[in-house]
Amino acid sequence: MTLKTRYKETIRPKLLKDLGLKNIHQVPKVIKVNVNRGLGEAASNSKALEASLNEMATITGQKALVTRSKKAIAGFKIREGMAIGCTVTLRGDRMYSFLERFINLALPRIRDFRGVNPKSFDGRGNYTLGVKEQLIFPEISFDKIDSIRGMDITIVTSASNDQEGKALLKELGMPFSN
């Protein structure tokens, strides 16, 4: 059973009852997942950006968007409009597919993993976590990477507060630490 069908058939009715909501449309759901990677080294190394774009496309199954600097910062040696990162916004079936692979395959592969931090909510039910290396994803092989880079993953939900967001992610299988 995929994560999407599990959400519709078992998680949504359970959350409706647990959160004491009156309507099925009030139940929180995952709206989108943003996967972002900042690449300060892309200013001097154009191959880093290209490799990063390919990795993001492999991990998410969707082409990454190049993020560019809004203004020049001399201390960081960047000019306005320089490529300094890449981002992917996942929605729909790709989002559920990525979440399922991330929760069930990637997170358990983190060294000394004891669960994700339950305090990383933003106050509006959205959850953000950082990943230190891309090797936790089974699609990335150690031989094909040039350097280890991390990424930020933001899960945007329709929850109105952190308690609803945490209940949703816990039901989806997110392993929170105590």
UniProtKB/Swiss-Prot annotation:
Any one GO molecular function term: tRNA binding
Xref: SUPFAM superfamilies: RL5-like
Family annotation (InterPro entries): Ribosomal_uL5, Ribosomal_uL5_bac-type, Ribosomal_uL5_C, Ribosomal_uL5_CS, Ribosomal_uL5_dom_sf, Ribosomal_uL5_N
GO terms classed as biological process: translation
Function: This is one of the proteins that bind and probably mediate the attachment of the 5S RNA into the large ribosomal subunit, where it forms part of the central protuberance. In the 70S ribosome it contacts protein S13 of the 30S subunit (bridge B1b), connecting the 2 subunits; this bridge is implicated in subunit movement. Contacts the P site tRNA; the 5S rRNA and some of its associated proteins might help stabilize positioning of ribosome-bound tRNAs.
HAMAP family registered for this protein in UniProt: Ribosomal_uL5_B (MF_01333_B)
Assembly with partners or alone: Part of the 50S ribosomal subunit; part of the 5S rRNA/L5/L18/L25 subcomplex. Contacts the 5S rRNA and the P site tRNA. Forms a bridge to the 30S subunit in the 70S ribosome.
Protein name per the record: Large ribosomal subunit protein uL5
Originating species: Prochlorococcus marinus (strain MIT 9515)
Lineage, opening ranks: Bacteria, Bacillati, Cyanobacteriota, Cyanophyceae, Synechococcales
Gene: rplE
